[in-house]
C-alpha cells in the first residue's frame, strides 16, 4: 500500500510461476491448512467462438489438484502435487467455490452448481463438499438458482453451528 501511496513500483511485491498443471480457466483456488486446492475448470486453447465453430479446443480437468506453495527467497515453487479425478462429479467450471465450516468443525469448501453436464448444455444442480479427507457429492440437493459464477458471501453462525451462503445474482437455469 505504501508503494502505491508513494508512487513507487509495485513489481517487487509480486511473484509468479508457470506450469502446465495450472493451465486452467473456470476453476477456483482454495486453501485448507497449508494445502492449495485447484478445483475443476478446463484447459481452453484458441479463440472463443459462441457459435461452436472449430476455433478452439477445451478439455475439462475433472480434477481437484492439491499442492503446496513455497515462497522462499525470490522464487516460488510448488511441491506435493497430487490429483483426485472424477469425470462425473468434478466436471465443473464457472461455478462458485464456497468456503465452509462443516457441522463437525472441519474446514473445507463446497462446489456450488457449475456448468456443463457431459451430455447436455445444462448446469449441475447438486453441490460437492470438499475437505482435506476427500470430496462428497450431495446428490440429494438441487440448486435451481445461481448456477454460474457470481459474487457471494459465506457466513458462519457460531451459535447455531451453521453456514449460510448469500449469492449476489448469477445466471440460473430456472
Regions found by a protein language model. Give the residues of each.
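Asp-box/WD-like beta-propeller blade repeats and closely related beta-sheet repeat scaffolds
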Residues: 1-33, 44
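Loop/turn-rich, solvent-exposed surfaces of beta-rich toroidal or solenoidal domains
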Residues: 111-113, 146-174
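Short coil/turn segments that connect the beta-strands within blades of beta-propeller domains
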Residues: 33-34, 106-107, 162-163
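Beta-propeller and closely related beta-sheet repeat lectin domains
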Residues: 25-29, 93-98, 148-156
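Short loop/turn motifs that recur once per blade in beta-propeller domains
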Residues: 11-24, 84-92, 117, 134-147
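Short, conserved, GDST-rich strand-edge loop motifs in beta-rich repeat architectures
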Residues: 1, 39-59, 113-125, 168-174
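Beta-propeller blade signature
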Residues: 1-5, 50-73, 122-136
